């Protein structure tokens, strides 16, 4: 019996040859833990300013397309375009995105940075789509989490309840949020978050439930349908003129016509 590395070729051999094969145990036993990964890699983005972190989140999709065109290197880190097997220490775009979100949430502990994040993130399309009110630090932290990989971030200490409550909200309100279940399974995402919490033996005690209820109260006060109304108000003066041409009396607020 021979032990080999887990590669595409060795898998083919496993399935097609009669000889006994085993994969090297170190490859089987090394499990990915984002909490550990986060502690080991946060320094890689320490030079990023708060504004730069927010710019990354606002332009996430465009940045992802560029990064995934080829191997992308920054500092000592390389995100590979293709990889037969992603290792526990390898950087990926999703892991980088999660690192930046964790970094930003931590920055909300500083009042000056909190105010900066609050003012800048309000213009992000996803925050407007959720109709999320930005009234305090907790609501700003929720804003930072929107669009992030909740199963990854849930493994980081103190991020458990914000992750699970947001996952529940997305599952409950996926239609209002315009989430296509074929592209993003909210129930599956919630299950992954809970699996992460269970694996770290996280206990939802009274204090944690209280924290969760605070996040839930903020989310329940959001209005996912407000984005269109906000945009309409922006053009209300001009749009009302056209309404008048169709015989509709001009109103103080365009939304009152609905």
Curated annotation (Swiss-Prot):
InterPro entries attached to this UniProt entry: Tospo_nucleocap
One Gene Ontology cellular component annotation held by this UniProt entry: helical viral capsid
Role this protein plays: Encapsidates the genome protecting it from nucleases. The encapsidated genomic RNA is termed the nucleocapsid (NC) and serves as template for transcription and replication. The NC have a helical organization.
Organismal lineage: Viruses, Riboviria, Orthornavirae, Negarnaviricota, Polyploviricotina
Domain observations: The N-terminus and C-terminus are involved in homooligomerization and play an essential role in viral RNA synthesis.
Subunit field text: Homotrimer. Binds the viral genomic RNA.
Gene from which this protein is expressed: N
Subcellular location: Virion
Name under which the protein is recorded: Nucleoprotein
């Amino acid at each position: 019996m021979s032990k080999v590395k887990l590669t595409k070729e060795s898998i083919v051999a496993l399935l097609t040859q009669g000889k006994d094969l085993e994969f090297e145990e170190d490859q089987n036993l090394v499990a990915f833990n984002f909490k550990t990964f986060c502690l080991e890699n946060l320094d890689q983005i320490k030079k990023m300013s708060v504004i730069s972190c927010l710019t990354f989140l606002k332009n996430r999709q465009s940045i992802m397309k560029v990064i995934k065109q080829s191997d992308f290197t920054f500092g000592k880190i390389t995100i590979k375009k293709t990889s037969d097997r992603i290792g526990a220490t390898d950087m990926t775009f999703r892991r980088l995105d999660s690192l930046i979100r964790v970094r930003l949430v931590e920055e909300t502990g500083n009042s000056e940075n909190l105010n900066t994040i609050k003012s800048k993130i309000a213009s992000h399309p996803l925050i407007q789509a959720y109709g999320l009110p930005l009234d305090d630090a907790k609501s700003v932290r929720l804003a930072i989490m929107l669009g992030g990989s909740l199963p990854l971030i849930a493994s980081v200490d103190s991020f458990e309840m914000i992750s699970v409550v947001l996952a529940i909200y997305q599952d409950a309100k996926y239609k209002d949020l315009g989430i296509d279940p074929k592209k993003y399974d909210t129930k599956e995402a919630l299950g992954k978050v809970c699996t992460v919490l269970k694996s770290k033996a996280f206990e939802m005690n009274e204090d944690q439930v209280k924290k969760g209820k605070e996040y839930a109260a903020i989310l329940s006060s959001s209005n996912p349908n407000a984005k269109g109304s906000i945009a309409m108000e922006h053009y209300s003066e001009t749009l009302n003129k056209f309404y008048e041409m169709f015989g509709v009396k001009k109103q103080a607020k365009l939304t009152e016509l609905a």
